[in-house]
Amino acid sequence: MHELLLFASVPAHQHHELLQQLAGLTAMQPQHRFERRLIFKAYRKPGLVNVRVGASQDVQGAEMQRLNKMLNGGMFYTQVVGPVAAADFGAPAPTVSVGDQDAQMSGMGVGVSAGVDEKPSTRPHRYDYDDQPWKLEFRDIPEAGTRSAVTARLMASASLPRGDIMVPMNAWGYNFVTEYAVEGDIFILHDIVIFLHRVLHYPTESQEPRRQLPALPEMTPLERSGSYVLQAAITVQDGASQETMKIASQHLFGLREQLKSAVRLEMADRLSLDTRAK
C-alpha cells in the first residue's frame, strides 16, 4: 500500500476556527482522539524478522505477512500505536481485592434476584495496560523525485497482541527507544482522512512503555507555541497504478484548494520523514 499526504502548520489561535471549518466541509463533528505512540528501532539484520512469537500468532496473517515483507527490506524505526481515552491519563491501575474475587466466584452460575436492582458502579476509572490494544505501523522513507507535489511513501500496518508489547517487539529484532502521545481530531472527506493534531511529551523519560499514564495537565506540547499539524492522507491499495495515484493526488489538491484561505497544505520535507535506522 501507499500513503499520499499533505501537511500544514496551524497556529494555536486558529485551531478552533479551523475545527469549525472542517466540520462544515466534511458535514461531520470532529472525532477527538488520543493515541500512545511507541518508537522502536531495528537492531537485527534484514531477513531475520520472525512473525510467529507467542501470542502474536493471533495477529491477522495477511497483514503480518505484508508487514514482514516490508520490514525485511531494511532496518527501520517503526511505531506501535495504541488508542487511549482522556480518562486514562492519571487513572490508577486496576486492582482485584479479596471482596472482588469473592463476588466474582459467587456470581458464577448465580443470577441476580428478580426485582432487585443492581447499584450503579461508583468505582473510579482505571487504566489497564495489560488490556491495551496495539497496532504496528510501518512507514518507509518518502519516495524521491516524485513529479506530483504530494508526499508519497510505502506503508503497512498489522494488529498486535494486547498488553505488554516488549516481548514480541524484542523477538522481532526491535528495541524500545521512546514514546509520546498525540491528541487531535479526525474528519473524513470522501477518501481523505484529515487529522488536526499536536504531539504531547511526557514529563519524564522512560526506558520501557509506561504501565500508567500521567495526568493530562502534566503533558507538555512538543510545539511550545501551541501550534497544531494538519495532516491530510489517502491510502492507495495499488501504488503501482499510476492512474490511481494520480486520482488520489488530485483529491488532495482539491482539498488544498478548498482550504487555501485558511491554511497552506504542502508536501513535507522528505528527510524529515526518514524512518531508516542508521
UniProtKB/Swiss-Prot annotation:
Superkingdom assignment: Eukaryota
Its predominant location is nucleus
Q: Name one Pfam family in it.
A: Med18
Q: Which PANTHER family match?
A: MEDIATOR OF RNA POLYMERASE II TRANSCRIPTION SUBUNIT 18 (PTHR13321:SF2), MEDIATOR OF RNA POLYMERASE II TRANSCRIPTION, SUBUNIT 18 (PTHR13321)
Family named by the database record: Belongs to the Mediator complex subunit 18 family.
Cite the record's note on assembly: Component of the Mediator complex.
- Stated name of the protein: Mediator of RNA polymerase II transcription subunit 18
Gene it is expressed from: srb5
